[in-house]
Each structure stands twice: as structure tokens, then as C-alpha cells.
Amino acid sequence: MSLTTATKSFGPVRAVDGLTLTVPRGQALALLGPNGAGKSTAIALLLGLIPPDSGRAALFGLAPERAVRQGRVGAMTQEGGLVQRVTVRELLSFVSGTYPAPLPLDEVVALARIGDLLGRRVDRLSGGQAQRVRFAMAVCGDPDLVVLDEPTAALDVEARREFWTGLRGLADQGKTILFSTHYLEEADEQADRIVVLGHGRVIADGTSAEIKRAAALTTVRVTVDGDASWLATLPGVRHMEIRAGRAHLRSGDSDATVMALAHAGAVRDLEVVPADLEDAFVALTSTAPPTVPAPVAATALTTTPAGKENA
């Protein structure tokens, strides 16, 4: 699937600004960004729900609407409604009947883990149960591409864990998966690749490890006797805080910082804490200005698995 220099505005607000994004088949991609970054608009463009003002969207080399009609795409959007006053089984049977080659119902039920809900009326589902049914509807057609917009927003911790178990089952079958989420640990654990949007543009694109290395700082913690102000001048150190007698050094080159500390010999209880995805996300989204190119170049981080063609 791909977006090519896609632009979309709503009145004076440019939600997507010249966005280019290509996803190979079989990849699980997480789309991240703060509120208003353009995630939902980008997904709507890919699905053909709204047309771009300029640029192009394509799924499997086809116009999105055509790929959707062929049953190659399953989507779970934030606003997806459910038919009321029918049972879950009746709803899924109806949805399956709209596809030329649907996934067997027992497989849908197993993937979504909704076996205990089949006899329940849709209008009596909890928010989390309704989300699981929406996921089941998204995979009824045995799609090649599954698009999920904030899929675990209404789920508790255990339900989220079960959801991702089911989704990884799809990924293991070679399905392409695109999801947006505010739970950064989900992106860290589940995505082969992460794209961070800001002001409708790509500001970072790569694996979780690549983005963390490129965008975030490692924390070096030490206990030092006496005046600690000199620690701020060590190689790599960009920020220092003293908390409860320990210095917390935010370093862009932790190896150089640690070597300098070891050479000084005046420190103890040395601890190096690698950056996590949340650190990188905050660094990227708090510094990316709306009108200049991204500080972390997508071309420098993008990794496309060998031999994979685009979805």
C-alpha cells in the first residue's frame, strides 16, 4: 500500500502535508503521532474513505475503493458502528456473506476470541466486547491488509494482550497490518516498523530500535561525592539533574560519557538506562516544527525487508 505526496486539508488545517508512505506486503507497521498529527486522516486516505486534495493512494496497485470491493482490505476504524438488536453470530454471518471468499466463522471467532459472545445481542456488549466484535468484522473477508485505528482504546490490559495474540496470528500468515495506537509499548512490541507523524508529515520511520537510537538520549546515573557541577561538562552530556544525591545525565553518546566518568574515578553506583520508545516519541514530537523538514530523516531510518513487494 502507498501514499504518494498526498495532501489533505480541512478548511485552514492541513491534516496531511505531502505525505509519502510505502508499506511492503507482510509488514506490521505502527503509525504514531500526537493528537492532530494526521494519523486518522492518513488511514482514511488509504482506505478511500476520503479523497486526497493532491497526490495518490493505492492498495495492491489498485485504487483503494477497488481493493476494498475485492475484499482485500479489512478495517477497524474509531467511528465504526455496529448493527443493533441482532446477535453477534447473526452480525458476523451477515458480514461474511458480503465477501466472495470469507474466512470460516470459527477461525474469525478464534482470532477475535469472542466465542463467549456469539449468542449475545450487539446492543448489550460492553465497550471492550464491541471492539473485539469490530475486529472480527474486519477479518471476516480474509483480507490481505488489515487496517486498525486505535484498536485497543476500549480494552483492559488482559483484553489488549489477547487482542495482540490474535493479530500476531494474522501477521504470521503474511498479512499486512497497519495500526495506529496511543499505547507506545504496543508499537514497541508488535510492529516491525514504526512511522511517527507530526503536522501531517513523516518525522521518523524505522524499527523501534532505530528510532530510539536516533531520537532519544540515554540516561547515565551516578553517585558522586561533593560538587557535581563538573559532570555537566562531560562528553555527550546534554542535560543534568541531581535527585536524592544521584546525578542523572542525559547523554547523546553514553559510551563517551561512561569512559569519561571511569577516567575521573570519582563516581560510584554507575547505571546506564537505555532510552525507551516513549523517550524517543517525546523528543520527536516536542521538537518537530510544523513548517520545516523532520529532524530524523525517514530515508535514513527506513528499512524494507528484502524481497517484499508493496501492498
Which residues does each predicted region cover?
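Conserved ABC transporter NBD signature motif
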Residues: 47, 55-69
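Conserved ABC ATPase "signature" region
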Residues: 93, 97, 103-118
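Catalytic Walker B motif of ABC-type/P-loop ATPase nucleotide-binding domains
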Residues: 146-150
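Helix N-cap at the start of a conserved alpha-helix in ABC-type nucleotide-binding domains
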Residues: 157-159, 182
